[in-house]
Amino acid sequence: GTLIGQDYK
């Protein structure tokens, strides 16, 4: 859900 399409937790 961040930047491009990668989700960081």
Curated annotation (Swiss-Prot):
Cellular compartments annotated: Secreted
Annotated control of activity: Stimulated by magnesium and manganese. Inhibited by zinc and aurin tricarboxylic acid.
Primary localization: secreted
Gene Ontology process terms (BP): DNA catabolic process
TM annotation in the entry: none
EC number per UniProt: 3.-.-.-
Gene Ontology MF terms in the entry: endonuclease activity; magnesium ion binding
UniProt GO cellular component terms: extracellular region
Keywords: Hydrolase, Magnesium, Manganese, Nuclease, Secreted
Influence of pH: Optimum pH is 8-8.5.
Enzyme class at the top of the EC tree: hydrolase
Task performed by this protein: Involved in DNA degradation in the substrate mycelium. Cuts DNA nonspecifically. Possesses endonucleolytic activity.
Subunit structure: Monomer.
UniProt protein name: 34 kDa extracellular nuclease
